[in-house]
């Protein structure tokens, strides 16, 4: 789930201004926001989907780039979910049919406490480009629904003093740790249930 684990942890630790140590010293039973995010990241990394059904196949999202200094093969191994329209023109094999099914259920569970599901239908199957756009749309919708249903609101980026990461909110999905701007998609796994339903799970980078 993480592109830059070391950088992520470094930003968190630098952003806490020493408050993590104070919190732990004052109450050993209370976890700081930083510790909670790290714990949730680890849980997300370890999550398995074998109980969903049989894994049929997987596919990747790669975006062509001229930045061969950072990406030697000329491809960024993920696509942007915040502004997919920017990556779409250079998305590798964007028009390839990657799911040969007329209906799929897509599960979004990162960075969510309670997962979000939606159904897509298409008589011709689904392409990479189509899935990138649709998944981005649903991320925007669920983030909006979270904000509307939460009593603990998202702290604006310019007002985050102890931690740069998004605070956890208590809306319908319990979003934690990341704004949409942090999120990219690097791959999708295709599962088939016992009753023939096709379910897609997402490999989201942050």
Model feature map: region roles:
Residues 112-133:
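Short, contiguous acidic and Ser/Thr-rich linear segments
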Residues 6-9:
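Sec-dependent N-terminal signal peptides
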Residues 17-19:
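Bacterial signal peptide processing site
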Residues 137-193:
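Short loop-to-beta-strand transition segments
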Residues 198-206:
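Short, low-complexity, Pro/Ser/Thr/Gly-rich segments in the mature regions of secreted, periplasmic
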Residues 1-4:
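Positively charged n-region of N-terminal signal peptides that target proteins for export
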Residues 23-118:
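Composition-driven low-complexity segments enriched in polar/acidic and proline residues
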Residues 13-15:
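C-terminal motif of bacterial Sec signal peptides marking the signal peptidase cleavage site
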């Amino acid at each position: 789930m993480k592109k830059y684990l070391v950088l992520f942890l470094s930003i968190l630790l630098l952003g806490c201004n020493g408050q993590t140590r104070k919190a732990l010293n004052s109450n050993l039973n209370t976890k700081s926001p930083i510790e909670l995010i790290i714990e949730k990241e680890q849980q997300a990394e370890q999550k398995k989907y074998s109980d969903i059904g049989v894994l049929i196949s997987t596919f990747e999202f790669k975006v062509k780039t001229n930045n061969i200094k950072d990406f030697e093969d000329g491809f960024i191994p993920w696509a942007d979910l915040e502004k997919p329209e920017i990556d779409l023109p250079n998305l590798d094999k964007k028009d390839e049919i990657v799911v040969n099914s007329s209906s799929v259920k897509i599960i979004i569970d990162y960075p969510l406490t309670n997962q979000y599901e939606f159904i897509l239908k298409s008589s011709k199957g689904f392409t990479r480009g189509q899935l990138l756009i649709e998944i981005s749309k649903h991320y925007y919708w669920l983030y909006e629904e979270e904000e509307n249903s939460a009593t603990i609101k998202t702290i604006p980026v310019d007002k985050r003093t102890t931690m740069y990461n998004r605070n956890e909110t208590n809306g319908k999905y319990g979003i934690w740790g990341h704004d949409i701007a942090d999120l990219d998609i690097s791959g999708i796994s295709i599962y088939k249930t016992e009753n023939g339903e096709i379910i897609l799970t997402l490999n989201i980078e942050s």
